[in-house]
Amino acid sequence: MSETRSEARITLAHEGAATVETGLPVLDHLVAELARAGRFRVALEVAPGSADEAVTAAGRALGRAVTARLDAGSGWAMLPADEALALVALEHAAEGRLVTNVDFSDERVGGVTTDVAARFLEALAVEASINLHVRLVEGTDPQHVLAAIFKAVGAALGQALRPVQPDVEEAV
């Protein structure tokens, strides 16, 4: 089995724009939400293939783009989407992993099962070498849960990707 070709670029432009073509409209939308919340520009393209291959390839491609720019090394965010509330914390690690309390069951959103999100986030974490902690604080609607998670992941990545400013001493 050959790996699906994919490419991602991240620009720290403080604008949150996204051009995403994975072949899965729901994943395209979620990655665009991630970029908006993180206030960075994402260009992500995945060659046509199966849905499973596209999800993993997209996560890996974004992970490669993230690891190339990971500066602060950590970030966290708690963000809502309607009734859902997600908490995300991440840090640079020797071996990336996804740690979550979310039940990514067989619920369907936009024609795909919600486990798509788990596979994407796991591929992102492993490829970017980050420990990605995702906690669902509140939420019942699967679409809102995924939106809250991706927004919180984006905001946490936005923190981790920003250059750390050196301490500035002020004369008194």
Describe the role of every protein-language-model region.
Residues 1-172:
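N-terminal intrinsically disordered, cationic/polar leader segments
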